């Protein structure tokens, strides 16, 4: 079951070592419906997401204002970077078959992968000497990377991992911008909030993302390395 909302944890008084009832309806992610307090052990402990000890000592998580979510605020956090890369490669984003979490981690640790554009610099020779890779698997991954170069505006925008920009928002932006990243980057926050379905939080997140020179440079390098939005 998913349980990432501190307010919900507090409201239901869910503690470590508790017994709970879990309900699933259709394809919806299972949810905790009840704590069995009559079975509560003496060793239960209250849980706070903010107390989580991140593997990287330089990392710290903070709750995003106005949201239930907590995020690591260290831009160089290894777990965060790998998570962003995994998202970019995922089925609903760039759909790079074979580039799952384990391969992303392996390439990251081999210093072959640190940002999106690095994916399109990977060569067969980089892979063949790594564990898990044989001739066929290396060739298959290179083929998958090359096939992903032809993509759509919604897939690419969603893949960037901009906060609050999911698949639906990406499609709205695609329609308004006529599949033009250049037009998207030129929009002001005021112009974006006038788009039906786009709120201020999303508009600010998009503007902040493309105002960051590092982000802009990575996107530009991806395009230079052959990504074609069709």
Language-model features, listed with the residues they occupy:
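Short, structured beta-strand/loop micro-motifs enriched in basic residues and often containing a Trp
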Residues: 1-7
